[in-house]
Amino acid sequence: MTVLLTGGTGRTAKHIAGIFRQTNVPFLVASRSSSAGTAENHRKFDWLDEETFPNALSVDQGMKPISVVWLCPPPLYDLATPVIKFIDFAVSQNVKKFVLLSASVIQKGGPAMGKIHEHLDSIKDVTYTVLRPTWFMENFSTKGEIQCEAIRRDSTVYSATENGKIPFISVVDIARVAACALTAETLKNSDHILQGPDLLTYDEVAQALTGVLGRKITHTKMTEGELAEKLMEEGVTPEEAYMHAAMDSMIKSGSEERVVSDEVKAWTGVKPRGFINFALSEKAAWRARK
């Protein structure tokens, strides 16, 4: 068995790769460019260039063929189209198993990853698992992410969620579940909502960060329109800005509170990390204010 990880320079794939190195699972990483720690396993791959598709599935001498693919869709407005094209190519090369990274609010047949989910479900003799994590904790700590820069620069977090709650999850836990799914003997054509253990409002996130950092962090509450404008000011495309703001409004109405999931422990046998644990480990990300 050889696993192909798309989105190879992304946060989740990096953690999956680390797990596979420790457990000696053969894998390749597909992305436009390599990164530290993945160069020896790298295959040049571009979702928008079908000529790179064969290269992504090419294995080194002595390796078994690719048998399962981690699908991490690209950050495109019409992300489903290129991913579906690659799935169809992979199936033509006898790949029969896929694990898709989707999102908690996106069901089969919905927009974006929902279309990919629906397509996987329609292919005869293909088995799959869809992972639907809620919002990433690491959005608060990754350099360049709007929330991270807002904490560093302005000591605030922005949202249009009002008092809506989110069970934020760490990329580390998503990767652990993904590694289990990618190495499972069988996949059951199922989807799984992944959540962290703490159901938090953004007010509570700000309060937790205040305690960890020793300086006041606030929650700047906005309307959906105000948040979209703020995101565009920070360089986000209009399509992404309006989509993100609309998702905040869904959170405001309770979209992330309706399902309680213990899938992380069910898959891995270990409870997911809590927000305070995450914040303590990432303090350095918020220390410098520029």
From Swiss-Prot:
GO terms for molecular function: oxidoreductase activity. SUPFAM superfamilies: NAD(P)-binding Rossmann-fold domains. It catalyses: agroclavine + NADP(+) = didehydroagroclavine + NADPH + H(+). The keyword NAD does not apply. It comes from the Eukaryota. Pathway: Alkaloid biosynthesis; ergot alkaloid biosynthesis. Its EC number is 1.5.1.46. Gene3D superfamilies: NAD(P)-binding Rossmann-like Domain, UDP-galactose 4-epimerase, domain 1. It holds the Pfam family NmrA. The keyword NADP applies. GO terms for biological process: indole alkaloid biosynthetic process. Keywords: Alkaloid metabolism, NADP, Oxidoreductase. Agroclavine dehydrogenase; part of the gene cluster that mediates the biosynthesis of fungal ergot alkaloid. DmaW catalyzes the first step of ergot alkaloid biosynthesis by condensing dimethylallyl diphosphate (DMAP) and tryptophan to form 4-dimethylallyl-L-tryptophan. The second step is catalyzed by the methyltransferase easF that methylates 4-dimethylallyl-L-tryptophan in the presence of S-adenosyl-L-methionine, resulting in the formation of 4-dimethylallyl-L-abrine. Monomer. Belongs to the fgaFS/easG family. This is Agroclavine dehydrogenase. It comes from Claviceps purpurea (strain 20.1).
